[in-house]
Amino acid sequence: MSDSNHSLDLHSYTQLEVERFRESLIQFYDKTKRILPWRKKECIPPSEDSPLEDWEQPVQRLYEVLVSEIMLQQTRVETVKRYYTKWMETLPTLKSCAEAEYNTQVMPLWSGMGFYTRCKRLHQACQHLAKLHPSEIPRTGDEWAKGIPGVGPYTAGAVLSIAWKQPTGIVDGNVIRVLSRALAIHSDCSKGKANALIWKLANELVDPVRPGDFNQALMELGAITCTPQSPRCSVCPISEICKAYQEQNVIRDGNTIKYDIEDVPCNICITDIPSKEDLQNWVVARYPVHPAKTKQREERALVVIFQKTDPSTKEKFFLIRKRPSAGLLAGLWDFPTIEFGQESWPKDMDAEFQKSIAQWISNDSRSLIKKYQSRGRYLHIFSHIRKTSHVFYAIASPDIVTNEDFFWISQSDLEHVGMCELGLKNYRAALEIKKRKVTSLSNFKEPKLTSARRIVTKAEC
């Protein structure tokens, strides 16, 4: 149902307000923008019949923004800064990325950042763009979203506006929050009519002179000022034309919010109107409406970190295997794992460990596992799954023989192979490595195992 106590006109600005919105946001950005490695001046593309050398800088700028924008989706800025710098040092151009082998040259650069389908989409987009003559690269968001694999409307708008100064709007979580509050859209703005309205507003509001700076300012405002739970309205550059803020002031003055219904009544806002007490304490943060969260499912697994040491060089090696090509962490490297799914833990994890060895170690080599120890259970949280791993650490003889599809990799190469963060977390747990206190996975002292056989931790999570 919709809340029809106001018209659709509530969710729009006059031309004067639009200009004020743009000016205030650009001024805010000029004063507060963060210095980031991917923030450079836009590079307007030349005419279609220009020689190739005139396209070099525009294409390079487009590539830099494409990499940064895909990395920034669902990853903190401080984390992206490290990954972006390493990526650009290794794959500095669109051509170098397109020609790089995905599993050995591209994926390892992403390892540890999570949401690995983003990496695949970025590589696919670069491969597609590299095949085009620069003049054939689309210049509108719709053409990008339809024609460039792995790129959606948000990424298209961000790349075109920031890199090529195209007046294209963008919509992400930060933008939804800012615009739903600025124009008092009380709905779930991530889908349906409300999302379409947000996109319409984003395209209408974008500054035609500085579209890239405007879009970055809009995202910056949502990230540091118009935050989800405690918006800093007193320092917000658009508070004077923010309708949620105006509502808050009316309520706090002891008055009632009333809108004149003119023309078409609103069919977007929902009827979930909070009590007066709630409004007094939470009026701005009530926008946008958040859908009910889907409960994360619980999954369990047994993971074994097998280690062997070269007797001559003393170099340590670890047993890994590639995860299936579909499903969670598809195609990434991980340690030997037995998935229990949502089933309860087996009563005897030591017995499970010994039973699982048959899947990984050849029959003649099982006696060559010299020591093993349970290291306990460790939780890793994905967006939709709470994954608990019961980790074992096993020391094997150098002569051990594994079954097919398993590989021994040196400790130094673990950092570069494209290991999933879940695997690295279990590895650190097994070897008692404190993530924040080491600069390399090889920087640790090997822990001592206290027994040659049965040591089982009865830890519950």
Swiss-Prot record:
GO MF assignments: 4 iron, 4 sulfur cluster binding; 8-oxo-7,8-dihydroguanine DNA N-glycosylase activity; adenine/guanine mispair binding; metal ion binding; oxidized purine DNA binding; purine-specific mismatch base pair DNA N-glycosylase activity
Domain Nudix hydrolase: 296-437
List of residues binding [4Fe-4S] cluster: C226, C233, C236, C242
Site (Transition state stabilizer): D172
Reaction catalyzed: Hydrolyzes free adenine bases from 7,8-dihydro-8-oxoguanine:adenine mismatched double-stranded DNA, leaving an apurinic site
Superkingdom, taxonomy of origin: Eukaryota
Cellular component terms (Gene Ontology): nucleus
GO biological process: base-excision repair; base-excision repair, AP site formation; depurination; DNA damage response; mismatch repair
Enzyme Commission code: 3.2.2.31
Motif interval(s): Nudix box: 340-366
Cofactor(s) listed: [4Fe-4S] cluster
Family: Belongs to the Nth/MutY family.
UniProt protein name: Adenine DNA glycosylase
Organism of this sequence: Schizosaccharomyces pombe (strain 972 / ATCC 24843) (Fission yeast)
